[in-house]
């Protein structure tokens, strides 16, 4: 799948361009060993064999540093937030909680030393950021008549 291949393609590009190992490590850990949920669910809903799911998992490496965890979570939240229909505080909060809790429950964070306190801080900061990013703006009316100088 093209979506899964972007990790290995990114690594090839990084090597071709002589990027340092630390950046290559970020490339291979930003999805860890997660499942491509959207495509997996569509496959299952279309009658696919639940035992034939290897193609829906990234073959990367789980993050080992806090910084890699931050990238993994921010990448997932950013992508998922684009599909929101409702940008209310509750909707954003639910999305962020679901993604971070899901990564933890899936064991994606188990090789890092990130603490629960740090994860909770991340949750709050990401929620605040998304609320600010998606907040409604007042539509300013245009002036009728002559334009002012």
Which ranges hold each PLM region?
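Terminal helices and disordered tails flanking the catalytic cores of nucleotide-processing hydrolases
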Residues: 2-149
């Amino acid at each position: 799948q093209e979506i899964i291949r972007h990790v290995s393609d990114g690594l090839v590009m990084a090597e071709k361009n002589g990027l340092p190992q630390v950046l290559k490590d970020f490339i291979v850990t930003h999805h860890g060993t997660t499942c491509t949920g959207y495509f997996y669910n569509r496959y299952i809903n279309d009658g696919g064999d639940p035992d034939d799911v290897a193609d829906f998992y990234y073959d990367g490496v789980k993050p080992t540093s806090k910084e890699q965890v931050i990238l993994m979570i921010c990448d997932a939240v950013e992508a998922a937030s684009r599909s929101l229909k409702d940008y209310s505080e509750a909707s954003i909060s639910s999305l962020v909680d679901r993604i971070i809790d899901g990564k933890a429950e899936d064991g994606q964070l188990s090789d890092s030393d990130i603490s629960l306190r740090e994860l909770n801080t991340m949750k709050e900061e990401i929620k605040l950021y998304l609320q600010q990013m998606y907040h409604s703006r007042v539509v300013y009316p245009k002036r009728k008549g002559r334009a002012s100088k």
